[in-house]
Amino acid sequence: MTAQNPSDQPSPTARELRLANHRLGAQNEKLTEALKASREKLAEINSRLADMAEPPSTYGTLLQLNGTGKTAEVFTSNRHMRLAVSPLLDRTDLQPGATVRLGENLQVVEVTGFADSGDVAAVVEVVGDRLIVADKLGEEAIVKAARPLQSLITNRELTTGDSVVVDRRSGWAFHMIPRAEVSSLVLEEVPDVSYENIGGLSNQIEQIRDAVELPFLHPEIYRHYGLRPPKGVLLYGPPGNGKTLIAKAVANSLSKSMGSSDKASRFADSYFLNVKGPELLNKFVGETERQIRQIFERARKIAHAGKPVIVFFDEMEAIFRTRGTGVSSDMESTVVPQLLSELDGVEGLDNVIVIGASNREELIDPAILRPGRLDVKIRVDRPDQEAALDILSKHIDASLPLAADLVAEHGGKEEAAAALCRAIAEELFRRDAAHRYVTLHLADGQTKDLYWADFVSGAMLANIVDRAKTFAIKRALSQAASTRDAAAEGGLNTADVLDAITAEINDSENLPDTTNPTEWARISGHATGRVVDITLAD
């Protein structure tokens, strides 16, 4: 067998050549893509190696850009340095107070914005483009305001008492931050409570209107007679009788009166700063005093805008106790003088008045209650039967769903509502053995019987009405379920209000504090002498 000569093999056809060429082209493209991917991977690795080899950057605070823009004053590593600025940087980005990144040769190479973290300090005073700030310990420092604060200063949105982020080392303040502490303690609003919403306190309302509203509405007459408006009003008396409601109604009435008065047309509204007294207490020394200063600073700021401001301290005895009576601390020895200085400072303002409310007026420091500070003292006592009817009429009226038989019996919804009010008042104000609550045993051997009528309050009456409404709703739901009629007739009836009175009395009958009967009697408004014991009715 002879070997075949290669030249004797048949030549490839044109089709075979085209297929071979296509295969070679595809292989070439794959090799090209692989080479490109390898180059990109190599470039990425080289970039990472370069980043790892790059020396660490230093950051600093730009103090100022010098005249030519080629150098800048920078505070870095606790040193004030003059450094070169990269020519690649836009000079408009180099704002004083901004944080800058420094290159290997301490050249400014990047602007990273303004610091959003640091120490928190309170603004004591705004001096041009600088601020006097104080920390929690009261240490003051003067810092420059960065660009984010400049517009706030220009628009007078940054004032004394506001909190800012500062860097004490570089001497800059960067941002204003909201302080929840004082905002949560103070409710700044125009209340929606009017005198018409308050029942049984017509005498007290007249007194406080004379003390508060007249000086605001007729300042020229007061000046003509040389009479200074009172700086403050104390509302005191047993709990639950409308002290806070009166204070809110004053602010609401002032807002309406000022808006409609031609002589006071510049007043658009009034402000009611409702200070939650016990929450002012703080374990850190000086914090309570600082918050009081901020509250009055806010009042002054609003008053300077020409708006009447009422600063209302609820539970006043909690923070302004008589000095020297503290058991575990002497906090009142500094808090009381702080309030006294603020009250005396209000003298130069025409639009600020302080209203305090307390159940324990005997615990408040006498210096606060003297004339010239809280001038007017109004006792808000428990309602009698007539006042109770007035209060009840605010809660039960013809707009409520009333039982059809009750309406038919009295000839109309208004008459039926009045009948329910009378039923509650007559039941509560009975003075017989069945309605006796407690017997007070006095130190001199005498005894004094107290009835439920002696403990009626506006809050108690409102609660009785709410209970009665609950009973009526539950009965209506039960009737609707049994009759499968969602519109089943219901409505408030006499049985509901009488059951509500019984439930209220049953819930309250074990509440008297027999461990300290004298204090309980005083808080309840029945301090007739030293009480040595309390006996509950059978």
Swiss-Prot record:
HAMAP family in the record: ARC_ATPase (MF_02112)
Positions contributing to ATP binding: G240, N241, G242, K243, T244, L245
PANTHER family associated with the record: AAA-FAMILY ATPASE, PROTEASOME-ASSOCIATED ATPASE
Keywords: ATP-binding, Coiled coil, Nucleotide-binding
Transmembrane recorded as keyword: no
Record's subunit section: Homohexamer. Assembles into a hexameric ring structure.
GO molecular function, one term: ATP hydrolysis activity
Family to which the UniProt record says this protein belongs: Belongs to the AAA ATPase family.
GO BP term, example: proteasomal protein catabolic process
Coiled coil recorded as keyword: yes
Chain segments annotated as coiled-coil in the UniProt record: 14-54
Gene name, Swiss-Prot/TrEMBL: arc
Name of the protein this chain belongs to: AAA ATPase forming ring-shaped complexes
Listed Pfam families: AAA, Prot_ATP_ID_OB_C, Prot_ATP_ID_OB_N
Domain of life: Bacteria
InterPro entries hit by this protein: AAA+_ATPase, AAA_ATPase_domain, ATPase_AAA_core, ATPase_AAA_CS, NA-bd_OB-fold, P-loop_NTPase, Prot_ATP_ID_OB_2nd, Prot_ATP_ID_OB_N
GO cellular component terms, semicolon-separated: proteasome complex
Signal peptide: none
